[in-house]
Amino acid sequence: MAKDFLLEIGTEEIPAKFAPGVLNQLREQAQKHCQELRLDYQDLKVYTTPRRFAVLIQGLAEKQTDFTAEVKGPAVKAAYDAEGNPTKAAQGFARGQGVEPKDLFVQELNGVSYVYARKFELGQPTLQLLPKLCTDLITGLHFPKPMRWADLEFRFARPIRWIVALFGSEVIPFEFVGLASGKASRGHRTLGGPVTLDSPADYEKQMLQAFVMVDPEQRRQSVWEQIHALAAKVGGDVEKDDDLLDEVTHIIEYPTALLGEVAPNYMHLPEPVITTPMKEHQRYFPVRDKEGKLLPYFITVRNGDDHALAKVKAGNEKVLKARLEDAAFYYREDQKTPLAELVEKLDKVTYHEKLGSVRQRVERIRTLARGIAARLGMESKKQDLVERTALLAKADLVTLMVYDFPELQGIMGADYARMVGEKPEVCTGILEHYQPRFAGDELPQSYTGQIVSVADKLDAIVGAFGIGIQPTGSQDPYALRRQAQGVVGIILEAGWDISLEQLIAASYVNFAEQGISLLPLADLQSALQDFFQQRLRFVLQEQGARYDTLDAVLAQGSNQITRAARKAQVLAAKRETTEFVPYSQAYIRCLNLSKKAQTQPLDPKNLIDPTEIALAAALVQRQEAFAALIEKGDYAEAYALASELIPMIEALFNAVMIMVEDEILKQARLALLGECVAILGCLGDLSLLA
């Protein structure tokens, strides 16, 4: 026989951002505990609303499965004396396993005989195990910022106010944080009252009758369908925003969507000025027409039924109107001061107490950005546009609009720059230089946006590392990992052949020229090369690169990000071919032997066998062409050229012994192999491939 199990933890309102993590934890914890307790079940569901977490296990067995195990003990020679009597070791082992010494038996493992005990454990009734399982599930949940309440030491997302625990129709009796488990749940805060749950099987149905839709996926789907239906009524649609949809899903228990109107006199404002207060502050969904143009409507979702919707609609419209009135005022006031004049106001804004003002930071970014443009071989006019972009990129930080709506930084700067006639390249660069703003965000596409974005992020990373701020574990308050990943992503997409070491050094000089002291450059270079290599590895793994391919490539460093990625791409393709096997074998054999060489260059005059003389000549013959291919970054052709040496290397190993007694000849041969390693390793250290 089997019954359904339900545990509901009722709380005060929980932040929406906690919900996805708790759902995963609750599911994993319930599965783990059932497995450890040997409790079979048919299905497992987890639920969350702003006022509860719950787990429903369908078809949970009424008793544990019986358990039989064979436990290994001491070796036979230690378990029995010469007369075959059990020693203290055997007796102690038997006692620890709850069996008699006479019940021990012998089995062989890896050629050694050991004594074993066979343990049998009868399954206990499930109801006896569930009180502890329930408390373990509750205490096993973790939250970013748990809180205490009353005089309790226990911490949780928010204070727990009730606990429902049922196995079939029977209450699972236990007490936790001063609350006794029972059948009494609570419905919607204003529409529903107390709910006495009859059985776990009726949980969703009974809670819905009390205006609580406990299944978050069902709530999400309901919200999305209602939004679409309302948008269609005004000939519009809603662009899917998963983050906003998830947030709304997790702040309501009973969704009812409603359509509101935006006053026409605000529709002249830039679109982000209208949609940012909607989405970020009010959790409204903007409505667009079929071409994507913003319509004077929004959709919001009420936590309740359709009672007095007209009043709720008017209230939401009033709140948005106040927000947009503020925005319109800021927009007018900001236009009274040209963007270029705002740059000087950045002197009064501290970036970091150890790294100067934002104005100083702008100068560093400006210098670094122009340097990057020059390194990329851009003409003077383009360098000027890059420098102008960098100068104006942070000016909007002192505007009224960005002060009240920080999400609009860069967006407003681009708009204000356009108004005063800045070049399109400058306006686009200002808009794009914050990108990528989050994981999965678009990368900047304009050369001004790409260069200023890299300069901006490098300045932030070098400065932070330079004063001892580094990401640790899950802590990265300055988003340095995301910024480094942005640098890597931009360089890869743009295909820049540029030295990371040189960029770090140039950034370091900018700090020094402002009198800002950082850690020694050598220490900083080492730490940052490792840091960026980790980010490059992450990006390439996300693109499908195998870990050992990256091990091989990155063993040679990642100073030139684009080249390292190109090597990984070529190596991934070549290792799938049949000719790669003898190639890698030759490389590894040459590598292992060449490690025994003294540090002296190859002198071909010391070679005597025709095979080694021919190999040395082939190396010299290909040296110039090979160097040119490496300089150009053409690793596929460099590999093809190196492959021509494989038959000669195999002939050498078949013809001569490397480790001869003649020291001069031995060292010459080892040096020759070292030369082979340098060429064959053009794609990486192949000995690291699995």
Swiss-Prot record:
Any single Gene Ontology cellular-component annotation: cytosol
Keywords assigned: Aminoacyl-tRNA synthetase, ATP-binding, Cytoplasm, Ligase, Nucleotide-binding, Protein biosynthesis
EC number: 6.1.1.14
Main location: cytoplasm
GO molecular function list: arginine-tRNA ligase activity; ATP binding; glycine-tRNA ligase activity
UniProt feature coiled coil, ranges: none
Catalytic activity: tRNA(Gly) + glycine + ATP = glycyl-tRNA(Gly) + AMP + diphosphate
EC class name: ligase
Superkingdom of origin: Bacteria
One annotated GO biological process: arginyl-tRNA aminoacylation
PROSITE patterns reported for this sequence: AA_TRNA_LIGASE_II_GLYAB (PS50861)
InterPro entries: DALR_anticod-bd, Gly-tRNA-synth_bsu, Gly-tRNA-synth_heterodimer
Cell location: Cytoplasm
HAMAP family: Gly_tRNA_synth_beta
Quaternary context: Tetramer of two alpha and two beta subunits.
Family recorded in the similarity comment: Belongs to the class-II aminoacyl-tRNA synthetase family.
Protein name as annotated: Glycine--tRNA ligase beta subunit
UniProt organism field: Desulfitobacterium hafniense (strain Y51)
